[in-house]
Amino acid sequence: MEMFGVHNPATELATVGLGGAASVRYNFSAAALYEESIRRGEAELTAQGALRAITGQHTGRSPRDKFVVRDSNTDGEIWWDNNKPLSPEHFALLRADMLAHAAGKDLFVQDLIGGAEEGHALPTRVVTEFAWHSLFIRNLLIRPDAAALPSFAPKLTIIDLPSFKADPARHGCRSETVIACDLTNGLVLIGGTSYAGEMKKSVFTVLNYLLPAKGVMPMHCSANVGPNGDAAVFFGLSGTGKTTLSADPARTLIGDDEHGWSENGIFNFEGGCYAKTIRLSAEAEPEIYATTQRFGTVLENVVLNERREPNFDDGSLTENTRCAYPMDFIPNASETGRAGHPKTIIMLTADAFGVMPPIARLTPDQAMYHFLSGYTAKVAGTEKGVVEPEATFSTCFGAPFMPRHPAEYGNLLKELISRHGVECWLVNTGWTGGAYGTGKRMPIKATRALLAAALTGELGQVEFRADTNFGFAVPVSVNGVDSSILDPRSTWADKAAYDAQAEKLVSMFIANFAKFEGHVDGGVRDAAPGVKVAAE
């Protein structure tokens, strides 16, 4: 077996059963991985210098093909209602077959770190069949100093072989695609998919399992920090404005997707960003756009024209087009990936029912309730001729990546909020003046003004009212914001229609939360909609 690149001889691939590979390229640089990707026909160079790859059949994650090994360690710790179990015997067969499949192949290895806080960092080795996957994960995770590579000892290993096809009958999985996580032994096996995001989210899943046992809260969120060290965390599902609202030229970006909250403050899990690019423009998001126009960035499933220029308006391959780039490609990104304890937590929702106010203050109990609910609303597909919004509840604002029971994360979050006196706000970026179809989208200018008022503390000085549906506190007036939009009912022409819509949404919240009732205390249960008590 030929070996190239700097690595620790004591942890060579032979130690995990990959000694039969034809060659191994350890910790290759971006330039070397460009050469390998293009030479092997995996990817192509764009006119501006980025590397474009197409993932084929899988243009997104495959949550139905993700499994967790159920053994004596994980049996009582994993939320099996939301995680699919795989027996240790099936995993052993899968591992043996994947190792055999890798024999004779050229493999690429990156030795990286998950977690910017040293005491909670996860040394991670990612072994890939594709050179461009090696560049992708090198961009996304934290790169250790070159001097640390000769002694690097991974605690998590990910083996990513897109050409491997699983056998459901033999391996206990659902299809030819498989993402299998052995949390006890720190091994993730990915086969049958070329979608690079599976690697990134596998690291997130493992950290989400490991950290709560150490009292560290893992979060699916973006985060930034102001010039006075006032950190803010933004929870939110896809399409709620998490990336857009945390990108603030007056504040330093900590990260855009995954963070931990420890005894020392917040820290990024990653060293890069994985941003959506569909309909990306230089005018609307100049910093992200600029990353797509340079060497080092990976473009995933982005259509190129005949001049090899990306067309971000073309979703013919998928609407889920992406770019992956290191954090230092963003001008105002944090160099450390760390900040102190958050002063403010923002929970974003895009309420397409038009019921929720644009901003509301939450007590710690209400914050835990809305964190466990993880609500947003998607607009139904126009091709079906349906204009009724669809409520989406993804607990902890990231259910697919949470191995433990949601109440474990929720209780930890509530405890940290109370201990550090964090202000919590629910911000609705959805519809006002009616539901989707009759109302209009919440003006981004108003959202930014309300957010700024929350972050600066200005909202602490205004008068509040209790929301009659959700019980949280809503400001009556805010400088620079049209007061009418602060009361959603007043923006509807038909008040009876608003009341009916509100009653419908409240009933959805209550029905969704029923599964958590037995896992939370009375204070959180009393934070349910319909309890008309405002935050003090």
UniProtKB/Swiss-Prot annotation:
Top EC class for this record: lyase
GO MF annotation, one: phosphoenolpyruvate carboxykinase (ATP) activity
InterPro entries: PEP_carboxykinase_ATP (IPR001272), PEP_carboxykinase_C (IPR013035), PEP_carboxykinase_N (IPR008210), PEPCK_ATP_CS (IPR015994)
Pathway(s) this gene product operates in, as recorded in its UniProt entry: Carbohydrate biosynthesis; gluconeogenesis
Keywords for this protein: ATP-binding, Cytoplasm, Decarboxylase, Gluconeogenesis, Lyase, Manganese, Metal-binding, Nucleotide-binding
A GO cellular-component term linked to this record: cytosol
Any one of the GO BP annotations: gluconeogenesis
Listed HAMAP family: PEPCK_ATP
Descriptive protein name: Phosphoenolpyruvate carboxykinase (ATP)
